[in-house]
Each structure stands twice: as structure tokens, then as C-alpha cells.
């Protein structure tokens, strides 16, 4: 699909070399259609990398998407230049009067902290509450999924004995589900986290559907029946080398990390890591945009609040 983003965003040139269509405002205006408005709350430290990863996977249907990036005013990024944030990102006050068809909340490297000790927690809480009436479908990823479940349902996260890092199999549990249209019975995806949730808590505290799970990863993807809330604990958006970079970063910092499982051939870190989830990632993000966002969101954004009330979100 054509994605509308600032043509000066560094991701643009990378995407164009991959033959991904990026549209400027002038050309978009000539199409005379309402684009889907997507808001990305990017909490990852390497923001430009995450921008490219997500935009690559969002560019997979013929729909036109208008992308905005959001950052936390209450947190200062140590790994991304302030000029980049000021140029390409908006703050919550700048978007709070707008409505969005979809929103992505990324992971964040703060899972070692209790939720309330994260420096931007109060701002995050306000954004999630706002999203109930201003966003139709929200896709939460990794820590973003754990935080969303905690705020909405009181589902806790629990420290694992060791970091879960690697490429793991998961089974799809709801045959024909719209988010998994085109999937086989099982698929693989990257996971990279120190914490997990309890399946029992999900079943007892929420009315969400568990859509996929695996023996090593546990619950992987769950969603509300109306697809307004989607929680994914893996990282389908990751590049081939993302887990490798995380491993070498931690090793060089002296943390003695485990080699990511099912990733390097023969666990030899000098080998090129496998890329065996890209087709699943393309399907998943395309299904989210088409079936959870495009097919369901009201043409008049103001009706999102009416839908939120009708479905018990308020």
C-alpha cells in the first residue's frame, strides 16, 4: 500500500530500495480518498530501526495509510537525536483531539521495572485511556502488550528464570480467524523478553480470545472479539539481524547472554541468522490493517466513541 510519511524520514530511502511505495502529500491528495490514519507510539530505543521495521510491514495492502509517530514527553531518549524526535514525532497534546483508525504500541526495554516505576507510566496510562475513545483498533507489542493488559485487566507480568530469546513455533488456535487468514496451522516468530504473563490470569480476568500459543513462549497473541484490542508478545516486525544485534550488545556489555534459540545455524554466531517469519509477519500486519482497521472502523471517526460506549470500553 502507499504509506504517507514525511519524505525526509530516514526510513524512506531504505523502503524505496526495497521497492516499497512511499507517497508524498501532493500525490496522495490526487487520489481523493480518505486514508486510514495510523498512530505509532514508538517506545523502542533504536527508534529509526523500529520505524523502518513497522513501515515495511504496513506497506502490504492497496490501502492508503497516513502515519504519525508519537513519543513520550515525560521521557528523554538516550539513543535517538532530539532533532529526529522534534522533526518526525508528535506529542500526546498534539494528537489528543484527533481520531485514528489504528494504533501500534511497541515494546520497550523496561520490563525489569514494576509498571508504576517506569518514568513515563502516568503519560502512558493517559494515552491508553484516551485510545478507548479516539482509536478504533490498537495493536500492542511485547512490553506494550503486557502494559496494556495490566492497565485494562490487572493481568500481571512475571520474571522468567532466563531471557526468552530466539525463533519459536506457535500454533494458531482459531481456524479461520481474520487475524490469521492465510496462516498455516503453525508458524514461527522471534521472541525477546525477560517476563511473561499467566494464561490462567488471562482466562480468569479477561474476555479476550487466545489466538496463538507455543510450548516455549506460552500465550503469544490474543485479542478482543471485535479486534479493537490486540496483544502480541512476540516480535513479528523484527529484521533478520535484530536478535543477533541484541545478543552481541549484551555479550559485549558482559552479561553472558544465551545464544538465541533456533536462530544461528548450529548455534554458530558467525553464521548468518535465519529469516523464517517474514511471510507470517506480512500476513499478520496486512490482516490487522484490512480486517481489524479498514473493514471495521467507522467512516466518521467521531463514532469511535459511540462504539466504545456500546462495547463497554467506557
Swiss-Prot record:
Site (Important for substrate specificity): 192
Source species of the chain: Streptococcus pneumoniae serotype 2 (strain D39 / NCTC 7466)
Family affiliation: Belongs to the MetA family.
Name the record gives this protein: Homoserine O-acetyltransferase
Pfam families per the UniProt record, alphabetical: HTS
Pathway connected to this protein: Amino-acid biosynthesis; L-methionine biosynthesis via de novo pathway; O-acetyl-L-homoserine from L-homoserine: step 1/1
Gene Ontology molecular function: homoserine O-acetyltransferase activity; homoserine O-succinyltransferase activity
Enzyme class: transferase
Principal location listed in the UniProt entry: cytoplasm
Subcellular location as annotated: Cytoplasm
Gene Ontology biological process terms from the UniProt entry: L-methionine biosynthetic process from homoserine via O-succinyl-L-homoserine and cystathionine
Catalytic activity: L-homoserine + acetyl-CoA = O-acetyl-L-homoserine + CoA
Gene: metAA
InterPro entries: Class_I_gatase-like, HST_MetA, MetA_family
CDD domains: GATase1_HTS (cd03131)
Binding-site residues, substrate: 163, 192, 249
Residues at the site labelled Important for acyl-CoA specificity: 111
Keywords tagged on the record: Acyltransferase, Amino-acid biosynthesis, Cytoplasm, Methionine biosynthesis, Transferase
